Amino acid sequence: MTYAAEDFDYEGLPIGSPMYAHLLAGAFSGILEHSVMYPVDAIKTRMQMLNGVSRSVSGNIVNSVIKISSTEGVYSLWRGISSVIMGAGPSHAIYFSVLEFFKSKINASPDRPLASALAGACAITISDAFMTPFDVIKQRMQLPSRKYKSALHCATTVFRNEGLGAFYISYPTCIAMSIPFTAIQVATYDTCMSFLNPNAVYDPTSHIISGGLSGAIASSLTTPLDVVKTLLQTRGSSSIPEVRKCKGSLDVVRFIYNYGGIPSFFKGIRPRMVVAMPATAVSWAAYEAGKEILIRVSKTSQA
């Protein structure tokens, strides 16, 4: 038995769908999102270091890719991706399943962007608790020092030298950044979808456009907090003594302001947006595609 696109509620899995359906769709989207633009994310991390590492890259993303590839090898742009893959799949599975749970509980919909934003904030708070240690390892691996042989070696070295707290020192900042980022992203996404896909039919183009726009807007507005997060997560590897002495977000904020004023809070904004637009578009499109596949499988099995 076949089904037309309009026979499926593309925006949601069937009522009563098992949690693993949301987990699988979320994991699929998370791995794709973080893998597609990983080299550009590595450039963004270096730009935000505010030391000699940041001078190894330029404001031009293409030139930075060419320079790093020629001096350090192409592989250096992908160092740490194993940590992202290990963390992104489960964390996005958690994020999307929690998002769908809260959206159903508070009746979030495209015409209620504030409810969607609240659901997104709840979801990211929980998923970031899982992802933050993996992000710390990723950013340490993205630096050119080569002091870590692998993601596992990085994790054990950081734990031995800096303790468990090093993996979570940036968590409050991550939440302070991720909640507005996700709230803006989800609200913008749902608002765009209400215009581009008002009938909620299977339309990947609308998911890609809405996802890209929501990612660009959310990433640009939250870049200052991302700079703070990067310095916190890499402080143990920083060549700047003042950074290594920072004990929390406020210390880092003061250092950044004294270092270069307001412009320093927007270091890496271009690569951050370049990463966020396609990554968010891929994330939403992959998640919605995963849901659509699971819906079809469910419908077929019930036929």
From Swiss-Prot:
Ligase in keyword set: no
Domain of life per record: Eukaryota
SUPFAM superfamilies: Mitochondrial carrier
Solcar repeat spans: 17-105, 111-195, 206-293
Gene Ontology CC annotation, any one: mitochondrial membrane
Entry keyword annotation includes Repeat: yes
GO molecular function, one term: ferrous iron transmembrane transporter activity
UniProt GO BP: iron import into the mitochondrion
Transmembrane intervals: 12-32, 81-101, 117-137, 174-194, 208-228, 265-286
Keywords, in A-Z order: Membrane, Mitochondrion, Mitochondrion inner membrane, Repeat, Transmembrane, Transmembrane helix, Transport
Coiled coil: none
Pfam families named among the record's database cross-references: Mito_carr
Location in the cell: Mitochondrion inner membrane
Family to which the UniProt record says this protein belongs: Belongs to the mitochondrial carrier (TC 2.A.29) family.
PANTHER family in UniProt: MITOFERRIN-1, MITOFERRIN-1-RELATED
Name used for this protein in its record: Uncharacterized mitochondrial carrier C8C9.12c
Organism of this sequence: Schizosaccharomyces pombe (strain 972 / ATCC 24843) (Fission yeast)
